[in-house]
Amino acid sequence: MGAYLSQPNTVKCSGDGVGASRLPLPYGFSAMQGWRVSMEDAHNCIPELDSETAMFSVYDGHGGEEVALYCAKYLPDIIKDQKAYKEGKLQKALEDAFLAIDAKLTTEEVIKELAQIAGRPTEDEDEKEKVADEDDVDNEEAALLHEEATMTIEELLTRYGQNCHKGAPHSKSGAGTGEEPGSQGLNGEAGPEDPSRETSAEENGPTAKAHTGLSSNSECGTEAGQGGEPGTPTGEAGPSCSSASDKLPRVAKSKFFEDSEDESDEAEEEEEDSEECSEEEDGYSSEEAENEEDEDDTEEAEEDDEEEEMMVPGMEGKEEPGSDSGTTAVVALIRGKQLIVANAGDSRCVVSEAGKALDMSYDHKPEDEVELARIKNAGGKVTMDGRVNGGLNLSRAIGDHFYKRNKNLPPEEQMISALPDIKVLTLTDDHEFMVIACDGIWNVMSSQEVIDFIQSKISQRDENGELRLLSSIVEELLDQCLAPDTSGDGTGCDNMTCIIICFKPRNTAAPQPESGKRKLEEVLSTEGAEENGNSDKKKAKRD
């Protein structure tokens, strides 16, 4: 199924709430994993960020959930800590906060925390495992030395003398034919696989190469990338991945060079003579050869540059949280009658204005004119399918520092920028509610379709006569967007998170039944008639 489950996970995390008396903002939210193998969304519902401000936000993670969860945990406080926030400049505060939390993701302390959130081993843990394995090897060697120290000379000769006699003819034949398992050619290419070499590779597993899943041989690197199990924290290569620099047993190596020493000298002399002859006959100068080599080097360098440009996160072997993962972020602050929305990525905030959808954010896509210009200026490319260097299909996000490595540009001008767009709206009686959601919703339904869907249900009442919970409406929306299977283009197969926030208090209490009202009116009218009748009788008696 690739990135999808065989069956969708439709368990929902939902909730409802309301703000303080000063900000009576009813809200409801729900989140669902859906067809994805993991849940990478996060959100904030904070009706009292301070006594005058409410905050609602959605974070849609990619490459892992760690950056989204980190933002949900720390971004509210980072916003409040900004100087501009304390001065009442909320737009500037949001911009500064987005860039500030993005910068924090590159610090060693935060990278470790992200690794813990993601459940990946940190470098310290890797080092401990490596040291532990080295200690085991040292202990084994010490035990072997101790055993040999207590052995007699006859026992030592028996152990090593017999091995040498048995090994010598075996190694000679292996060197001569090159057919014996474990043989190695002059170019360092490994011969047919040998179980002893596989064991050696496994024992030397906790090294830098094994942890990156790469070997010093490009072919082995390919095997490691294909053969490694997805999601393996250390990215260890399988036994089939062996280094081209692996050494053969010393006995075999020395015997090989003893037998071929004279032959190699003769071969070198013949090679020199042939080179001189070819240069004289063809008129091929060394300068021309150097020029061709320079051209080849230039072409190779250009190809390397192109490959580097088109690299995507994770291709270098070891994934690093915050570099190979990131998140969108759409944050809405409500203070008094002001709604301020900051957005980086393709999550979205939409307001219902007299039943019409009013977009309060702009989806950042690489193919858009402004975004494309920035990406190219930073040295990047956008592929035909709308991906930056063939990888990320977003142009703005928090994290993704793999795309933010141009040292000549400030953070906001990198290929992927964390700088948000800001929109401000003065709320009126026409503004009923707003919706904040990730692209798992917006890829299935348009802004107006979502507003219409909610509008048709927000006044519905349950069997007890009370207004429906907002979270129940969101849950129904998620089910509406969920694809029946994964056979399509991925629409409806993403994680889904959505929040509905009403700008006015909701009268959730059940209305008084009409029959009760009529009975009460009849009683009151009867009593009034009787009083009027009695007064007439009294007047008649007096007359």
From Swiss-Prot:
Pfam families reported in the protein's UniProt record: PP2C
Post-translational modification Phosphoserine, affected residues: S183, S525
Any one GO cellular component localisation term in the record: cytoplasm
Lipidated residues (N-myristoyl glycine): G2
Chain residues that bind Mn(2+) 2: D60, D439, D494
Places the protein is found: Cytoplasm; Membrane
Modified residues (Omega-N-methylarginine): R22
Binding-site list for Mn(2+) 1: D60, G61
Gene Ontology BP, a term: regulation of cell cycle
Ranges annotated as biased composition (Acidic residues): 123-139, 259-310
Cofactor binding annotation: Binds 2 magnesium or manganese ions per subunit.
Phosphothreonine, modified sites: T122
Chief site of localization: cytoplasm
Subunit relationships: Interacts with NOL3; may dephosphorylate NOL3.
Protein name, UniProt field: Protein phosphatase 1G
